[in-house]
Amino acid sequence: MYIHKYIHTEAFMSKKYAVLVVDMLNDFVTGALKCDRGLAIVPQTAKLLDGCRKKGVPVIFCNDAHIKGIDHELKLWGDHAIAGTDGAKVIDELHQSDSDYVVPKRRYSGFFHTDLDVLLTELKVDTVIMTGLHTHMCVRHTSADAYQLGYNVVVAKDATDSFTKEDYDYGIKYLKEVYGAEISDVDTLLKTL
């Protein structure tokens, strides 16, 4: 019998974390799909990433990298985060490092037809800390796939947001109730790691 993932219980293993940064790109924060609420989470997101790097916790950017005129998502949202453009680059404030990993994606989920699961498996990660935009969309879909693949999901509630408070609240509630996500804040997470 083949089992895809290890059984993740604290009784058998201590947690091995990675932080997933979803779509903290120029086009999402200040560009084509500008989100004013996205600007508000930049300081806490940067604080979490800096702390994770210092503690040796992998930082993985899951970035939209669309193909202009091809990708299905562009029909709904218009051109944004086109691969190779400034809009598809991580915002400067997050200080992307050479030690960070980048997983380009063409759909909402960071797992859909990418090598994110392979990367996490090779890093021996069992728990993902979710950050970025948007709590009710790409963060939610990435969290769903993480859960389905057997990862524990933690959401840094002050390092993720959505276009509106209602969308954010819906996303947080859904992640907690449907995937059993632990909802925490950056300061608490940095003490836990």
Regions found by a protein language model. Name each.
Residues 2-18, 46-55, 79-193:
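Active-site-adjacent betaalpha module
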Residues 15, 34-52, 56-65:
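A short alpha/beta connector and helix-capping loop motif
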Residues 20-22, 63, 157:
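Active-site flanking residues adjacent to catalytic metal/cofactor-binding acidic residues
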Residues 26, 67:
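Short active-site segment of divalent metal-dependent hydrolases/proteases
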Residues 27-31:
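Short acidic, Gly/Ser-rich segments with clustered Asp/Glu that frequently serve as metal-coordination loops
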Residues 32-39, 75-81:
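Short glycine-enriched, charge-decorated loop/helix-capping segments at active-site entrances
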Residues 65-66, 160:
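Glycine-rich beta-alpha junction loops
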Residues 70-74:
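Metal-dependent catalytic neighborhoods of phosphoester/phosphodiester hydrolases
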